[in-house]
Regions:
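Acidic, glycine-enriched catalytic cores built around paired aspartates
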Residues: 23, 28, 39-266
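Acidic/histidine-rich catalytic neighborhood
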Residues: 2-31, 35, 71-72
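Beta-rich nucleic-acid/ligand-interaction surfaces
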Residues: 1-9, 55-62
Length: 266
């Protein structure tokens, strides 16, 4: 499989997913972070559909690949910040932990906050997200198109609320309340545990997160009215083009599975 590194940048700002030394005070970073959380939660089915391939039907959930359940890993530092925002604001500074390797002549090293067990399909790794469910034989163009589109929708909705607010103090108050509401509504998508365990399958069901291991069932997300409206609104693909993509991917899956079955019988 592939690990697709994704982030956004802007002239004069650099990477918008760079938390800086005080991420709890970085409004741009927190806004994009929450927008991404919102997007992935609302469109987890589309992200899953974007990597629906015959090879992934065997790979996901095993072979050091993430499970078919889409979730987000943030790491301890961001988990703490998100929890504080949900409670009404960052009341204390959140600092990155360090490692003392026991050698006086060497400096303390920052503890890596990224996910190393590889069981999270969508993980924050320092200054970017990694989408880890794309198949090895698959182009990453369509998964990244889906991710860009769903985050664009999320940012569009956030900006629609914030842009009319011209007073600076009221703007920050509105932003803080908006981020708090986003976290409260979409925190179910956040998961830092073992994605391979049976307990996660049960927990995901309790959270009402989609668990779609089958390719055909996953591709059905492309045919929903929600998906057609999303891609048409942002002029990515038309409903007809989206339907064609569903038909083509379904046909490819059937052919690949048939070839595998016929080869096994030789």
């Amino acid at each position: 499989g592939k690990h697709n590194n994704w982030s956004l940048s802007a002239p004069g700002y650099g990477s918008l997913l760079n938390p800086g030394s005080s991420p709890q005070e970085n409004a741009i970073f927190l806004t994009l972070l929450c927008a991404t959380i919102k997007a992935v939660d609302e469109h987890a089915d589309l992200l899953r559909a974007s990597v629906a391939k015959s090879g992934n039907e065997h790979r996901l959930g095993a072979h050091e690949a993430p499970p078919a359940i889409i979730s987000i890993f943030l790491g301890d530092l961001l988990d703490e910040i998100i929890e504080q925002i949900e409670k009404g604001g960052t009341k204390k500074a959140c600092t990155q932990k360090t490692i003392n390797i026991g050698v006086d002549t060497l400096p303390m090293f920052p503890l890596d906050a990224s996910d190393r067990n590889r069981t999270s399909p969508f993980a924050f790794t320092g200054n970017k997200f990694e989408f880890r469910a794309v198949g090895s034989s698959q182009t990453c163009a369509w998964p990244m198109t889906v991710l860009n589109t769903i985050v664009a929708e999320s940012l569009d909705e956030i900006c629609t609320i914030l842009e009319p607010v011209k007073d600076k103090p009221r703007f920050h108050a509105t932003l803080n309340k908006l981020l708090q509401n986003i976290i409260k509504k979409h925190k179910r998508i956040l998961f830092s545990g073992d994605g391979y365990g049976e307990a996660w399958i049960e927990e995901a069901e309790r959270r009402k997160l989609p668990n779609v291991p089958g390719t055909i069932e996953a591709l059905a997300a492309l045919e929903t009215p929600k998906a057609k409206a999303l891609f048409e609104k942002y002029k990515v693909v038309s409903p007809v083009e989206l339907h064609a993509r569903h038909e083509i991917q379904t046909e490819i899956f059937h052919k690949e599975i048939s070839i595998e079955a016929e080869t096994a019988l030789l």
